[in-house]
């Protein structure tokens, strides 16, 4: 019997990739990456010369098909694998990235009459121009005491589905009326592949306020009478967990991709969330940290708990049969990059060059020689606001304790420690809310690059940290869901637990907490938490006052 394979399609912000994976052992056989021709559209609408307003971030849905039709044939060619041996395809996508489409599934921006209307295009996840609509939703929900607010830390983000949908209605009612569906890009790709609209629970729950149902028509009517039946008329109330077979690959799509018609197509998922089983996690109490420019924390529990400061709790949102809790830090790697770029003197860069290493490695070696607390420097990790547990984008970073003898290495270590304190705050909040966290797993770009950071995280949280073996954990996890959608009868797996047992692996390196270091960090964390509560919970609004002065000064220039 021929070896069987699956393909994970990972749609990111700037590019898309395909990872071809062997079903029997998770071997990553081939990968192809293709950038989107139009990238992130935040200046001029393509083909129109129309200038976009500030905070807009759009994409061209043609780019998604462009990538699809290139990366899959490429991994087949590079690997020598026959399309007949591919048993499943799964997709993940940034979210909320949504668009209006007609009855045939054609995005309205691809129709001549709407090509020059920005609201007919794909609104990318980081489109923030729907903030007024988000404010209206939050104010009304708070006024009415809507229970859904508590599930999302007390605020609905402008990045999410309903603010974006309401913006279309507000600014372009003709687009809203012409749309047969408002749909997530991830669900649209599934529709293109198999001809079936099967909306996934992950994005519905975390980005569209779904909790085995949506908010009532009465709530939407109170926002705008025209919005009353947005769910009935423009969406779907049929929601499916990960790993469900959405349908079989359409013959015309199979021909373009070099695959066989009827190949299993899985329901979609959000990029971070699909990675969890690829880190070997298939049950409750094990937190997966996707560590890169920002940090996403995911953990499953057996009971629904409403915990302040979480990004959401969704049944079947991460793993079928569990409640998935999501939290996050808006900047981690981005803070380190900022520090290296703006706070390190040229002399350090030259010393690093002479030592044959980069600045991170050079400072990391010096910082590793310090003991916890030795620098006397402490930071609040809010360079890009705070997602969890304060849910406040207007908070800013803070560094204190510097003297005339403070070194770049001491400051660098304090920055690393601050991000670990941010994660520790999230863990404590979850556990105090009744969600135990027994183990930590890490994946993403940072764990393999910064061993000092990982040891600090272990010491601060007082937990062992295991590292995913794959450098493409998201795409691998995505592919695993394709194997589940295919099922054992086709050579795949009937559930994600069996898939993970065969296809997911961990590195040999395990970061174990040092009890003495943790004892020292508890003292530092107590100070961190005092500052966290002072500046983050309204005790002192100095950060917001400074930000307001800055904004006013720039407007007055």
What does each model-identified segment do?
Residues 1-43, 62, 84-138, 174, ...:
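Glycine/Thr-rich phosphate-binding loops that ligate phosphate moieties of nucleotide
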Residues 68-87, 172-175, 219, 223-232, ...:
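Phosphate/pyrophosphate-binding loops at sites that engage ATP/ADP/AMP, CoA/4′-phosphopantetheine
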Residues 67, 71-79, 189, 276-279, ...:
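Stable alpha-helical structural segments in soluble proteins, enriched in small hydrophobic residues
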Residues 1-2, 250-259, 269-286:
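Conserved phosphate-binding catalytic cores of ATP/NTP-utilizing and phosphoryl-transfer enzymes
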